[in-house]
């Protein structure tokens, strides 16, 4: 790690003395590793959100060899000889081509909002990028350095794998893309036919499936495994025992039939395995990281498959907390928040997002070697708050963290939940935490006077844990630090012409009487629409980043913003043309 200090010192030579003092007193910022791979030399490449760098370490993680800065947050990487393809995103999603020889970015290819998960196609002639917020996957020609084909999926693609014959790509949709006031709400895996680069199918997973994160394909190409959360939204949030609210699972997809087969729970009857993240497999093992309980599961693959295939009623499998009994070892890791990992030979290389501790696990002995990659690492209150928000150790039996219902940087899971704070049998749609501290009251029914109160009540009544006040204040600080992602509906950061017309419709319909001010809310209760449960009505939510928080209305009955206006006539008491509805939708989705 002396290399890092050496690089930092040399980079500061031209800085002002005051700048040097400021950095020295601040200590080393967290890495917040977004991706990690080994290159052909066996070196460890890591993209870091916290520093906006691509770092190259020795294989053991003890020596920093090179560090390359980027202008936006690096989200994923793909090494190829003397080049590294790096996806970046803050305002503009791009695939950046870094020359390791010169240390310069040779090209920055626009791909789409939320660029992540770069990967080569089976023939290595093209690179494929998931655009999380553009809801698309693009094909990039690395020679011409431009996007040559694009296909839309459902909602927030974040990972993908190819079938062994290369004919199909299977893509995760992070969240459900549907209305929430129905019996079955679940995210899907989209299937892309590669010849025509078209979506041919959406495979819906088990009821409650959300936060789809990792994917892998079995060596024989028969099955694809998808790691995800499994929300039990059909029951009140009255307890946690035996996964009453949230469980963690991996779904099994039959590749040839392109069908969901069943979901395997990775929790135990009296011990949750929250924060399920990445998944990998070979003939002998399945490996899964649990970012909330800070461990890795090592599953006997042949024994699991034999038991799975002989399981008579697979529709009941996603409630079987004993399924993996005797088939899995839970290996505790050092640090906090294992997410992405590398499976190489006989070892797993696992960074920890909230600690910068590198764990190396021998898959034969399950012995763990830990390396501190960032000595002198310091955390701000906001950093600590994000860590607590994602840590299932602050929950009874480790079943969930705040991330369980608010995945994707404290946003929404797209489902309805029957919280106990306003009665029973009246489910409400999950809200994003963005700007919650500056737009009181909290909850759509306004039952919490402030987000500060809601944070403490959430730990107590949802995670059945009593937080210390210092911890709660850090979570407040984290939530206050959240900032909106620029809307993918914007054009070069500005309203499109259609959205400008929609702004006029917004003003004509007097939407601003309730959705006013910098956050587009008057922070008051209004009786509007049908099925008004409470005398005072509903709290007025912010419209900032509303493009990201579907479904809409208090119970998620509107799958899209267009349905809010066209079907449910929200706030509309006069005839409005189809053209005006489309323009209004464009404007609101641009906020």
Residue ranges of each PLM-predicted region?
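Predominantly soluble domains enriched in secretory-pathway, periplasmic, or organellar proteins
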Residues: 16-387
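Intrinsic disorder/low-complexity segments
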Residues: 7-8, 19-22, 447-448
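Short amphipathic alpha-helical segments
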Residues: 9, 52-54, 562
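Bacterial N-terminal signal peptides that target proteins for export
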Residues: 2-14
């Amino acid at each position: 790690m002396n290399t890092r200090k050496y690089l930092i010192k040399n980079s500061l030579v031209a800085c002002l003395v005051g700048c040097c003092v400021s950095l020295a007193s601040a200590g080393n910022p967290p890495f917040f590793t977004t991706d990690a791979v080994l290159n052909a030399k066996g070196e460890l490449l890591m993209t870091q959100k916290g520093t906006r760098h691509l770092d190259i370490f020795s294989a053991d993680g003890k020596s920093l060899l090179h560090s390359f800065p980027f202008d936006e947050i690096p989200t994923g990487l793909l090494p190829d000889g003397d080049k590294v393809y790096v996806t970046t995103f803050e305002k503009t999603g791009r695939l950046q081509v870094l020359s390791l020889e010169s240390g310069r970015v040779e090209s920055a290819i626009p791909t789409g909002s939320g660029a992540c998960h770069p990967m080569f196609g089976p023939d290595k002639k093209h690179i494929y990028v998931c655009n999380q917020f553009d809801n698309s996957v693009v094909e990039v020609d690395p020679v011409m350095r431009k996007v040559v084909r694009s296909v839309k999926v459902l909602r927030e693609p974040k990972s993908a794998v190819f079938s062994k014959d290369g004919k199909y790509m299977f893509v995760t949709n992070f969240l459900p893309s549907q209305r929430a006031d129905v019996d079955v709400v679940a995210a899907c895996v989209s299937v892309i036919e590669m010849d025509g680069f078209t979506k041919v199918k959406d495979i819906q997973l088990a009821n409650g499936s959300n936060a789809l994160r990792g994917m892998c394909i079995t060596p024989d190409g028969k099955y694809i495994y998808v790691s995800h959360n499994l929300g039990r939204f059909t029951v009140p949030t009255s307890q946690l025992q035996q996964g009453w609210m949230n469980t963690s699972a991996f779904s099994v997809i039959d590749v040839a039939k392109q069908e969901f087969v069943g979901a395997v729970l990775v929790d135990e009857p009296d011990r949750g395995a929250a924060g399920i993240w990445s998944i990998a497999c070979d003939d002998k093992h399945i490996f899964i990281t649990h970012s909330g309980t800070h461990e890795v599961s090592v599953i006997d693959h042949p024994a699991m498959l034999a038991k799975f295939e002989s399981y008579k009623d697979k529709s009941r499998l996603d409630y079987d907390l004993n399924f993996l009994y005797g088939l899995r070892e839970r290996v505790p890791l050092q640090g906090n928040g294992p997410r992405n990992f590398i499976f190489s030979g006989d070892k797993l290389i696992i960074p920890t997002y909230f600690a910068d501790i590198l764990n190396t696990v021998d898959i034969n002995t399950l012995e763990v070697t830990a390396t501190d990659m960032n000595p002198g690492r310091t955390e701000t209150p906001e950093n600590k708050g994000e860590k607590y928000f994602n840590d299932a150790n602050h929950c009874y039996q480790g079943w969930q963290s705040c991330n369980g219902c608010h995945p994707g940087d404290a946003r929404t899971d797209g489902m309805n939940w029957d919280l106990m704070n306003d009665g029973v049998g009246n489910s409400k749609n999950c809200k994003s935490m963005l700007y919650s501290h500056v737009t009181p009251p909290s909850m759509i029914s306004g039952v919490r006077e402030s987000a500060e109160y809601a944070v403490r009540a959430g730990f107590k009544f949802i995670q059945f844990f009593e937080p210390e006040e210092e911890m709660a204040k850090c979570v407040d600080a984290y939530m206050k630090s959240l900032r909106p992602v620029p809307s993918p509906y914007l054009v070069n950061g500005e309203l499109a012409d259609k959205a400008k017309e929609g702004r006029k419709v917004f003003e004509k319909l007097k939407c601003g009487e309730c959705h006013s001010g910098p956050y587009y809310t008057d922070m008051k209760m209004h009786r509007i629409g049908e099925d008004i449960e409470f005398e005072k009505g509903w709290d007025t939510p912010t419209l900032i980043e509303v493009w990201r928080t579907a479904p809409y209305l208090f119970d998620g009955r509107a799958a899209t913003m267009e349905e809010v206006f066209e079907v449910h006539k929200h706030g509309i008491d006069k005839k409005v043309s189809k053209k005006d509805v489309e323009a209004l939708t464009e404007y609101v989705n641009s906020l």
